[in-house]
C-alpha cells in the first residue's frame, strides 16, 4: 500500500513538472502580465542578455524593483551567465 502511494505521488509530481515546464514564461509572448511593466527609459541595458521589466508587486516605497526576462540559454539576476548545462545550447544550429 505504501509503495503504491509513493508511486502515485511521484507520478503526480512528474506530470506537474512537465505541465509547468511547458507553460510559456509570462512576458515571453509580448504579454508582461498585470504586475509587470516595461522598464523606464535609461534601463535598456540593465539586462545583459534579456529584457528589463518593472515588477510592480515587489516595489518598496521609493525603491522600484527591476528584473530581467533572460534570452534563451542565459541565466542570472541580470542574464549575464551563459547556461552551458542546457543541452539545447549545443544543439542550436
Curated annotation (Swiss-Prot):
Cysteines engaged in disulfide bonds, as pairs: 39-52, 47-68, 70-79
Entry annotated with the keyword Mitochondrion: no
Keyword list, A-Z: Disulfide bond, EGF-like domain, Neurotoxin, Secreted, Signal, Toxin
Molecular function in Gene Ontology: toxin activity
Gene Ontology terms: cellular component: extracellular region
Signal peptide: 1-30
Domain EGF-like: start-end pairs: 43-80
Record's subcellular location: Secreted
Similarity comment: family membership: Belongs to the EGF domain peptide family.
Function: Ant peptide with probable defensive activity which acts as a potent agonist of the mammalian epidermal growth factor receptor (EGFR). Mimics, both structurally and functionally, vertebrate epidermal growth factor (EGF) peptide hormones. In vivo, intraplantar injection in mice causes long-lasting (several days) hypersensitivity of the injected paw to both mechanical and thermal stimuli. Its long-lasting effect is unusual for venom toxins whose effects are usually immediate.
Protein name: OMEGA-ectatommitoxin(02)-Rm1c
Species of provenance: Rhytidoponera metallica
Amino acid at each position: 500500500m505504501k509503495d503504491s502511494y509513493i508511486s502515485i505521488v511521484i507520478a503526480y509530481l512528474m506530470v506537474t513538472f512537465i505541465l509547468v515546464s511547458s507553460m510559456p514564461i509570462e512576458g515571453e509572448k509580448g504579454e508582461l502580465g498585470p504586475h509587470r511593466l516595461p522598464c523606464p527609459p535609461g534601463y535598456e541595458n540593465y539586462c545583459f542578455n534579456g529584457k528589463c521589466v518593472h515588477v510592480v508587486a515587489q516595489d518598496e516605497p521609493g525603491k522600484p524593483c527591476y528584473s530581467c526576462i533572460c534570452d534563451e540559454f542565459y541565466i542570472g539576476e541580470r542574464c549575464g551567465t551563459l547556461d552551458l548545462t542546457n543541452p539545447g545550447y549545443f544543439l542550436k544550429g
